[in-house]
Regions:
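N-terminal catalytic or cofactor-binding beta/alpha core of small enzyme domains
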Residues: 1-144, 155-160, 164-168, 186-196, ...
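An accessory alpha-helical subdomain
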Residues: 171, 175-180
């Protein structure tokens, strides 16, 4: 019998200026919802400490469990809409983490690519959020802090899982706006339902990917992940 799909949902703990991270609350709200479409899926919630020295822990989790899809949540206090990040860049800003420590260098992975595009169709997901009444947009700038760094690490792991398949597992980062993480005109419940829709879409994409044998290419009906030049 085939193993159930493994899905990872991540959020962040507190960091300087944000004592209660809204992404953590949103992730908990999301997983409290009943979702018949993913009732057979094994979902892991990981609250990531907002620390540069904790990134190896994320790597270890990704490499050990080999997730079929990853949904990462983070907070962006200055944004007004839910932002779906189309890429992660291999660069960091010299800003202290929750422990007061600074990043070890100016690049996340010194020998890595300059940028990696999301392996999920972010633009299509933005459209679905808007249809649900959520203020949402696509973004090419996930920042140069730990949100972007975690995204880059998750995308590197996903590309390492591609093996003989044409596509890597879907990985998507969502930035939640403002201090509350809830966009104007939306309730916490409404946001949780919208994030649930994203999760269901990622699961569907993972099912299609796993149904393809080695070397089989994407169906013409499969949305192509958004390309994002470096």
């Amino acid at each position: 019998m085939a193993r159930p799909l493994r899905i990872l949902v991540t959020a962040f703990g507190p960091f300087p200026g944000v004592p209660l991270n809204p992404s953590q609350r949103a992730a908990i709200d999301l997983l409290r919802l009943r979702r018949p479409a993913v009732s057979d899926v094994e979902i892991t919630l990981e609250i990531l400490p907002t620390r540069w020295d904790e990134l190896p822990r994320l790597d270890a989790l990704l490499n050990r469990r080999r997730f079929d899809a990853v949904l990462l949540l983070g907070a962006a206090a200055r944004r007004q809409q839910v932002c779906l990040e189309t890429r992660a860049v291999n660069a960091v800003r010299d800003f202290p983490d929750a422990a007061g420590r600074h990043p070890p260098g100016r690049r996340i992975m010194p020998q890595g690519l300059d940028a990696l595009a999301s392996t999920a169709p972010a633009l299509a997901r933005v459209a679905s959020l808007r249809r649900a009444g959520i203020m949402a947009s696509a973004s090419r700038d996930a920042g140069r802090y730990l949100c972007n760094a975690a995204y880059f690490h998750a995308l590197v792991a996903a590309h390492g899982q591609a093996w003989g398949k044409d596509v890597a597992p879907p990985v998507l980062f969502v930035h939640l706006p403002g201090r509350s993480g809830v966009p104007r005109g939306t309730s916490r419940t409404g946001l949780a339902r919208a994030l649930s829709g994203l999760l269901v879409a990622l699961v569907a994409q993972a099912r299609r990917r796993n149904a393809c044998g080695p070397g089989l290419r994407r169906s013409a009906r499969e949305p192509r992940p958004d390309t994002a030049p470096a």
